[in-house]
């Protein structure tokens, strides 16, 4: 018999910024690194013989919670990846709801009929993932292993291992970031002992789900900001000059704020010239989503850092909370490259 801990990756950019990231190689967030520390404590007294993960940054980084303290190598396998979301990749969930609501509902509730151009079906995910998991189990007979993967893929796999048909997978729960499930494999196949346990996050007040509402909705739909190129009139309303590019932050057709991007200011650095929400939209836990637009924009251009000036201590505290650090010049800097973070 093989015991397998299935672990979802820590909070990553797609989770924080509410962007569809399947095969997109997003980074771990500041809260995500705290979740990894809590996960390491959770596994401190659990014997593990081998550690596996998908080959994406967010799972490999999360797996450090187990393989580094235990002195084990990390085995990566692309068959453990998240579902490929095709043309959805890189779009916010709110944008997808506005443009493709029926398929969003299918993704959340009717996985047997969900498919988007260029993406995988749920069955295709199962056809690569379960054989890979079976191979891991067979190679580690009599041992205990940890396997790090992704939310949607694990939801599909765990539901299937519980004996549910494809048509019922949409009624199964989502697991929080770093949620742990335990399965056993023997001659009769897989048995799910428990799934989606996140008590190490609840105890530390680090749950991503506790700060989000979408999963509480019956159809699991977003009601959030969306983003469009900013018009000259909107620039004027926000007091943003003509330099660079600007993204309007909107909600229900109403201007809520914006982001000004200055890609020509410094080579290799993505500068933000203006970032904010209008007063009526502040204090509603809406302020961080627009940063995801800047991160994706600048990463595509090859930048490894995002920088901005903060005018007051409150704003500086906000950006520190989300991983920015102060430079010797007094600017706030966020690293968006793929080097390992200590």
Predicted regions mapped to residue ranges:
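Conserved catalytic-core motifs of GNAT/GCN5-like acyltransferases
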Residues: 307-309, 320, 325-338
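Conserved acetyl-CoA-binding loop-helix of GNAT-fold acetyltransferases
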Residues: 34, 277, 283-296, 321
């Amino acid at each position: 018999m093989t015991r397998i801990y299935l672990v979802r990756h820590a909070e990553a950019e797609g989770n924080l910024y509410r962007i569809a990231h399947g095969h997109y190689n997003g980074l771990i967030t500041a809260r995500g690194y705290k979740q990894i520390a809590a996960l390491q404590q959770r596994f401190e007294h659990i014997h593990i013989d081998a550690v596996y993960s998908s080959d994406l940054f967010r799972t490999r980084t999360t797996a450090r919670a187990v393989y580094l303290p235990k002195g084990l190598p990390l085995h990566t396998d692309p068959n453990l990846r998240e579902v490929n979301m095709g043309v959805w990749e890189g779009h916010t969930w709110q944008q997808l709801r506005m443009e493709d609501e029926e398929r969003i509902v299918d993704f959340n509730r009717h996985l047997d009929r969900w498919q988007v151009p260029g993406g995988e079906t749920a069955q295709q995910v199962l056809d690569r993932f379960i054989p890979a998991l079976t191979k891991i189990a067979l190679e580690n007979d009599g041992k205990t292993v940890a396997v790090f993967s992704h939310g949607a893929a694990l939801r599909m796999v765990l539901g299937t291992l519980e004996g549910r048909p494809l048509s019922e997978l949409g009624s199964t729960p989502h697991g929080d970031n770093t949620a742990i499930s335990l399965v056993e494999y023997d001659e009769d196949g897989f048995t799910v002992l428990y799934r989606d346990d996140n008590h190490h996050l609840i105890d530390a007040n680090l749950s991503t789900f506790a700060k989000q509402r979408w999963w509480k909705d019956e159809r699991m739909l977003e009601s959030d900001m969306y983003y469009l190129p900013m018009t000259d009139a909107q620039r004027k309303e926000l007091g943003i000059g003509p330099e660079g590019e600007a993204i309007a932050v909107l909600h229900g057709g109403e201007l809520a704020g914006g982001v000004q991007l200055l890609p020509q200011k410094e080579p290799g650095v993505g500068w933000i010239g203006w970032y904010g929400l209008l007063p009526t939209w502040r204090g509603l836990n809406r302020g961080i989503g627009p940063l995801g637009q800047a991160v994706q924009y600048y990463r595509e251009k090859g930048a490894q850092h995002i920088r901005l000036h903060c005018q007051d201590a409150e704003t500086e505290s906000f950006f520190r909370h989300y991983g920015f650090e102060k430079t010797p010049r007094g600017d706030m800097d966020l690293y968006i490259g793929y080097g390992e973070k200590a």
